[in-house]
Each structure stands twice: as C-alpha cells, then as structure tokens.
Amino acid sequence: MTKYLLLDIDDTIAPSMYRGSDAIEIETWGRGHLAIPKYIVEWVKLFSKKENQSIWWCTDRSNETTQIEKQLPLKADGKLMFTKPPKGVWKKQAAIIRFAEEHPKDTVICADNDCDLMNSDKLLGNLHLIIPTGDIKALSKEDLATIDNLK
C-alpha cells in the first residue's frame, strides 16, 4: 500500500508573498515571488524519501514545480493533469477524484488550500483532504503530523 500526497503550491506549501526569516526562496525567473518555510521544506523532503510514499503535484504551476524540484532538491513522482472534467465539475476536483479511483487500495491525501471547494458527497473512502491551518496561510506543523499519521 502506498501513501500518495497530492500537493498544491500556493497558500499550501508557499504562503503568498512569504518573507519570514526561515524562508527558502525559489527562483521563478521573473514569474513572481515564491518562498517556502523551512519546516515545510524539511518535512516534504523527508516524506518524499520514505518507502511507499509518493508526492504528486496538484497545481497548474508546472514551471514552479520544476524549479522547486531542482532547487531544493526534491523528488516528486508526477503531476496531476487537469483535463476532461465532467460538465459542471471543478477540473482540479475531477483530477483528484480520478487519481483516488485509480489507486483504490492506497491512501490518497490532497493538501490544498482550495479543498473546501470540493463536493464532499463525491469523495472516496481512500481520499483525505487537508486544508492548511497555519497562521501564515500554509500547512502547519500539526497539518504535517496529521498527514504523517494517516494510513
């Protein structure tokens, strides 16, 4: 069994305009400021190295995912594709649900500040939503512990 983490960037791992003393700056080549708190960087690196755990990007910022992977460095196993949603369904939600359907015996965790937009009546039993609760508009240490403890 694998634990998949579907990970968003904006206001999930990278708070908007974050400039804290622990900020790890990501060069975006002129596409705006992007910084990730050190505690999140360290946790994500550890998560990605553990056996039977896999990070998949859940964002439409593909250029930034490449920069994050190169600069931290970090191993991500893929990116969700936001295409072909059913009519009237948020394309990101459709991709998340499709991923969970494709991995029915695994734990799928979506960490995204927009998870509250998902229709909860359409969620599968193996899909867990983590909405960041940190004061800086990012995943808190408690959120990260919750992810670690999900089986």
Description of each model-found segment:
Residues 2-90:
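Alpha-helical substrate-recognition element adjacent to the catalytic core
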